[in-house]
Amino acid sequence: MHAPQSVAVTLSVALALVPALAGGCASTPVRPAAHGAEAPVDPAIAPLSFMAGNWILSQPNGATIEEHWQAPRGKALLGSFRRVLGNGITPFYEFTQIVAEKDRVVLRQIHVHGNFDTDPRRAEPMVLVMEKCTASMATFVPAKDGANAGALARVTYSAPDRNTLLLVVEPRPEAGKPAEKPLEFRMKRAG
């Protein structure tokens, strides 16, 4: 058993070493940006503000789809998606960024399994470019430069009303086969 005094000395030494072990991080205070000092929203992505929010869809099979979009800020907005099955298992997640670049708006998305392992078929991000956009709708199509989009033709987000976000995923038609029906996810604002 250690004497109370030696425990106090050991604790004091350990606490004194924390800033050094943390690479000096603890000695540099973090100051929040001054109010009003935020980067202005790039005009190319400003119309996408209709996507911001928490969105949810309860499916008849007991699964729940959730999508969360941060508001556009600077040149980007970020989104996350998960599908939770009725038994509580999340088979996959998707993380998406939409970024205003020099001459286009790009949507990049990564897909990971529920255990956060990368899907080998989707090791590289899917890359789409904005085809058209209004104040309540945005359509993205595969980029020509390595889109990694598989059989995807287009993705459209729209807001039929303030509390609904509609995601439509359209497959690319295959030659000689009947066109597949688009997938539609009509999500409601959560909270």
Regions from the PLM with identified roles:
Residues 1-7:
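N-terminal secretory signal peptides that target proteins for export/translocation
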Residues 10-23:
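Bacterial N-terminal signal peptides
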Residues 26-28:
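Bacterial signal peptide processing site
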Residues 37, 120-135, 162-191:
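Edge beta-strand at a domain terminus
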Residues 39-54:
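N-terminal helix-cap/turn-to-beta initiation motif at the start of protein domains
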Residues 42, 57-145:
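Central antiparallel beta-sheet cores of small beta-barrel/beta-sandwich binding domains
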Residues 142-144, 159, 169-171:
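Short, structured patches in soluble enzyme cores that scaffold and shape functional sites
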Residues 153-163:
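Extended Gly/Ser/Thr-rich low-complexity repeat segments
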